Design a protein with these regions (language model features):
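Glycine/tyrosine- and acidic-biased, solvent-exposed loop/turn segments at the edges of beta-strands
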Residues: 1-157
């Protein structure tokens, strides 16, 4: 297995070196849709979850009754001041970056979706910004760390 420097997996390092990019809360709130406030609904068809706009007739149980598949940024908040997560969608499917936050506002995890499948690397951090978990979906590899950066578990994704 490949050796990892936990310092190079810290949130600060990845942000400073532009390995990952995180949208500001202001941008997400201004340009995104709130899952709890906007007319967007999750529908499962054929084993896939789609985010859709329901038509004016209410909330039907068939995709044909939806006025369109959602594309854009969707977010959910902790009250009015914090965001729980934001996620990109294209044609109703998870597609692009997803970022989840602790209730303190610090980043909890970061991952990338392609047509509702996780791709690349999923990073999860402790609230102090140290790496907690790294899952590399391209290499089918999973590594977990303690708060001091020591590997505690590794195996397949």
């Amino acid at each position: 297995m490949e050796q990892f420097d936990p310092g190079k997996l810290s949130l600060d390092y990845l942000l400073e070196n532009k390995v990952i990019t995180v949208l500001s809360w202001e941008y997400v709130i201004e340009h995104g849709k709130s899952y709890s406030r906007d007319e967007v609904e999750q529908v499962t068809r054929g084993g896939r979850d789609y985010m859709c706009y329901p038509d004016d007739m209410g909330y039907p149980d068939d995709l044909s009754d939806y006025s369109g598949l959602f594309s854009g940024v969707l977010y959910e908040g902790w009250g009015v001041l914090n965001i729980v997560y934001y996620r990109h969608y294209k044609d109703g499917l998870k597609n692009g970056v997803e970022v989840e936050f602790y209730s303190s506002g610090k980043i909890k995890n970061y991952c990338v979706w392609n047509k509702s499948r996780l791709v690349g690397k999923l990073y999860e951090w402790y609230e102090n910004g140290m790496i907690k978990k790294l899952v590399d979906y391209n290499r089918n590899q999973r590594i977990e760390f303690n708060e001091q950066g020591k590997i505690t578990k590794q195996g397949k994704a």
